[in-house]
Amino acid sequence: MNIKTAVGAAFLGILWSSSMAFAFDTASKAPVGQSKRFFASEFGKTLPPVGYVQFCATNPEECKPRGGKKFKLAMSPERWNLIYQVNTYVNGKIAPVSDQDLYGEPERWVYPTDAGDCEDYLLLKKRYLEGLGFPPEALLITVVLDESNGGHAVLTVTTDGGDFILDNRRNDVLRWSDTNYTFLKRQSHSNPTQWLALVKQPTSNSGFVSGGTSR
């Protein structure tokens, strides 16, 4: 059993012991002719965040090319339940603390144990979901600008009903177009070290992810 499988099994134990439940959203399927609203457009290659490059240097096994094409996960009540529970559990488990306060540096991406910045939350959520059998091609680290034009990182789950966002600032799992964020870039489905722009024009704020600790 590898570490991700073990982590997923451990999370299932937590989930079952707490007897939590989440109702399946039957309206999550994208209506015919409206798919542009539910799926983010990609505009070619761009540079990854500095912190992610450093993360891959220390965790090369997490950043290996996967191959394959774009992946849209077929959703079910069970998968929705797991996505919601992972998001809620990690949001409650990890205290929001900036990298500057934790490590004395502006950005460091790590798997958190009890405290972390926005990117640390999503790394742990991604690890849990992969351990629960979710394909990594459907779990994409994503950089956005929030309502205050500050850098922030979230986890995108690409599904047959749209691109959904796991965010440390909310427990609700929303479609990307319902978040009020400006989406800048995210990982490629086939190679996590290659990033794709989600805006036509490059943004100077997209190199670092900061200000993502607030709820």
Residue ranges and their predicted role:
Residues 9-17:
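Bacterial N-terminal signal peptides
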